């Protein structure tokens, strides 16, 4: 192959890679909005409004990794994420005196999900990751709205065989008004009747789990005790699924 032909080949290959990157980013943006949104602003009847006033405002505890986001650092890419997939944002933190860059992918519809549920619940972030990482991710997801102010990190977890567990009573002593959304059953093994299971997410741009939860969460806030509903949930996800912590 002549030098001219090689130059043409490299130019075309570069243009193709740019086009492919743009297509993936555009497709992800499209997938986020192709599903009909949940109509959360429909006026409630006087009876419904009265019912809501008679129960306590609930607390929704949110996990981060593989629940709301997926991240990888400095070229370490899971097989489930296609090489070249653009991240939604990056964060730079110092871990053990070493600077580390994380590329973070947001689960589809996470921003809309947080906007809606923050009107219904007090939101609390509880991650088994280190504070320097988890706090930076929470800041990005909050987008300056002040809806993710309360945060708990690895130092607030209990290390047991099989991983970290999260003590919900440390967030609020009244367990009747608190629920946790987490992809790891081990994290809430001591509070199974307060748990809302969700499949782990890594890269699927067509995922709608967060959207699908909105009608359920809308109804759950009217209960006097969330455990009366969540204890009936038989959809227990395998406890052996892989969880990564930073």
Curated annotation (Swiss-Prot):
Subcellular location(s): the record lists: Membrane
Q: Which GO terms describe its molecular function?
A: phosphoprotein phosphatase activity; protein serine/threonine phosphatase activity
- Keyword Hydrolase in record: yes
**Gene Ontology, cellular component aspect:** cytoplasm; endoplasmic reticulum membrane; Nem1-Spo7 phosphatase complex; nuclear envelope; nuclear membrane
| Alphabetized InterPro entries for the sequence | Dullard_phosphatase, FCP1_dom, HAD-like_sf, HAD_sf, TIM50
What the entry lists under SMART domains is as follows: CPDc (SM00577)
> What PROSITE patterns does the annotation carry?
FCP1
Keyword Isomerase included in the entry's annotation: no
Q: Spell out the reaction equation it catalyses.
A: O-phospho-L-seryl-[protein] + H2O = L-seryl-[protein] + phosphate; O-phospho-L-threonyl-[protein] + H2O = L-threonyl-[protein] + phosphate
Q: What EC number is given for this enzyme?
A: 3.1.3.16
> What's the protein's topology in the membrane?
Single-pass membrane protein
Q: Where are the transmembrane segments?
A: 3-23
Domain FCP1 homology, chain residue ranges per copy: 53-220
Q: Name one Pfam family in it.
A: NIF
Task: Please tell me where this protein is predominantly located.
Answer: membrane
User: Which keywords accompany this UniProt record?
Assistant: Hydrolase, Membrane, Protein phosphatase, Transmembrane, Transmembrane helix
GO biological-process terms attached to the record? nuclear envelope organization; positive regulation of triglyceride biosynthetic process
Q: What does this protein do?
A: Serine/threonine protein phosphatase that may dephosphorylate and activate lipin-like phosphatases. Lipins are phosphatidate phosphatases that catalyze the conversion of phosphatidic acid to diacylglycerol and control the metabolism of fatty acids at different levels. May indirectly modulate the lipid composition of nuclear and/or endoplasmic reticulum membranes and be required for proper nuclear membrane morphology and/or dynamics. May also indirectly regulate the production of lipid droplets and triacylglycerol.
Checking PANTHER family in the record gives: DULLARD PROTEIN PHOSPHATASE
- Sequence similarity: Belongs to the dullard family.
From the Swiss-Prot or TrEMBL record, give the protein name: CTD nuclear envelope phosphatase 1 homolog
